[in-house]
Amino acid sequence: MTIKILPARLANQIAAGEVVERPASVIKELVENSLDSGATRIDIDIEKGGAKLIRVRDNGKGIAKDELGLALSRHATSKIHTLDDLEAIMSLGFRGEALASISSVSRLTLTSRPAAQEEAWSAYSEGRDMQVKLQPAAHPIGTTVEVLDLFFNTPARRKFLRTEKTEFAHIDELLKRIALSRFDVSINVRHNGKVIRQYRAAKNQLQTEKRIAAVCGNAFVRNMLRIELEHQGLKLHGWITTPDGARQQSDLQYCYVNGRMMRDKLINHAIRQSYEMSLKPDQFAAYVLFIELDPHQVDVNVHPAKHEVRFHQARLVHDFIYQALADALAQSSVIDKPQVNESAFHRAEPEERESQPETTPQYSPQSVSTTVPERVYQAIDKTPTYPGRTDYEIKPRDRAPSDSSVREARIADSFKRTDWIESKLAPKPNVGKERHAEPAPSKREVHAYHELLKTPDFESQQAEQPTSIESVREVSLPQVTALGKALVVVDEQFVLMSSDSGVALVSLPRSEFYRTKGQLTPSEGALKAQPLLVPLSMKLDTDLVRLAQDYQQDFAQLGIQLKARNDKALMVMGVPAPLRQQNLQNLVPDLLSYAQTWMKGEKASTQMLPALIDWLAVQVTTVKSHYTLSEAIQIIAELEQLRHGQLPLDDKTFVSAVDFSATIAKLKP
């Protein structure tokens, strides 16, 4: 067989074997091109898992008409021109193979318009020699690449595609990695015409954490630690989880080198080594880490799909990552964790609880519980039982109660529950053994808290050095005018804040109540109602249906859309976002019954809306047993945003000034 130069299409199809493995590979190349073009918004349309259609549209710089033909040619790129450029590459793409390879195994159309060009042009290649054809098109500034019928001309490749669900799962995982690498870019994904993912651009810390939660889950955000370290031009930043956030599989491990997503053995080894003493053999660390260094110190051109890199100073990078993560984990383990008490799942009767001896959990820094069930045990174990509460008493029933009697009992209990939650949101008194099953804090927490808040013992000072009664003056705490910066969580329920006006202690349960109330309070017009996919129909008493009709506008102000089917049936068409996860089958009838009770009390109808907001806030607010500093910061930030900076600083159950003058005087020599 004689030696011949391969036709352009065949050569590109061979190259596509390395570049285009599956639909996710196509999207990776196209989205990376969009990011390199400076796009801030990327819209991705997919059909049949990418086998039928892949369309990627961006608002980047675009491609001039004269360069469209070159864009579909092999080894044509605007990102490098010399070997020095390759050694200092910072863009995601640089080989100039992607578009040519993709167009050789699909029907590809490239449409683009730069800002300096009044009209857009489309380019596509056809024939054995892949001649590029141009035609005018309508398109905004930016670029759209449409890929139809992937592998239509290579049946051997097409038959190896998996199911639509599997291929889309690969695409979804890829886009999660890209979404974490560029928080400043909005990414929208539609599959078969349905919006699947919407990653909005993050402009502040709260929005950044929301995107992390959207990709990694809320459990990751609850247990994450912020990492930021720089040494000799090597920078590491991102988030890792404490051992409490460990996973049963390595599905939340994202690492980036100079913005490029990586799976590098050196980096993985350093991370595993830093967690060696913290995780069990069947547990995996979860992290989102970014490594930045001089591009001359890393070679990115060592893998066909650019999944691996090679560091010139591999040992330095390895030890730097290991030390940074090991130090962060060591600092996070200062707060001791309680061991799990599984007996909390087996709730005793009130008489049994009173007869059981009171126990204090044992604490050990090494006994860090990490699995999801164990964290549930911890949460239940730390939930106190309250004297006189009969919520959990189980009493025999002679007959099943009617719906109306159940509702009346629930409404009566809701008034009691309002008082109970108000008391729980208020600062906790020192009730000692009255706390019953609530576990005691660790010795270190008790000591730190007492050192923070204790005042000098005036009686002992008077015994040692007698003074007149007039010399002892009552200390009046200053008025809190601003919250400022969160410093530390105290007693798991309060956060210490520092501002120019002084130091104050803020109740986090009370903050959660005000945050929920702010979410339920209309600010500019009515709350936005989110339509239910399936309207909820319920049978009610005639008077409740009539009440819903008479005060339909009031409920609409709260974002609750009610529609009467007849005089004994009501339909819930939509509710505001804070109520979407509630049991509407119980909540809506209870709300109507509460409103009816309010009106029977001869209250002014104009005052009913604030009363309903307060009632709903009490029902929706979930009080946690303990808070982390990141959760406290998020709660305060959202509260300030909802109330436009007008915080309830006059509420003594929400915030109280802390006076250190007596402690400072005691410490002075």
Curated annotation (Swiss-Prot):
Family: Belongs to the DNA mismatch repair MutL/HexB family.
Biased amino acid composition, Basic and acidic residues: 344-356, 390-408
Residue ranges that the Swiss-Prot or TrEMBL entry lists as coiled coil: none
Compositional bias of kind Polar residues: 357-372
Highest taxon of the lineage: Bacteria
Function of the protein: This protein is involved in the repair of mismatches in DNA. It is required for dam-dependent methyl-directed DNA mismatch repair. May act as a 'molecular matchmaker', a protein that promotes the formation of a stable complex between two or more DNA-binding proteins in an ATP-dependent manner without itself being part of a final effector complex.
Span list, region Disordered: 343-408
The protein, known as: DNA mismatch repair protein MutL
Organism this protein belongs to: Vibrio parahaemolyticus serotype O3:K6 (strain RIMD 2210633)
Family annotation (Pfam families): DNA_mis_repair, HATPase_c_3, MutL_C
Entry's Gene Ontology BP terms: mismatch repair
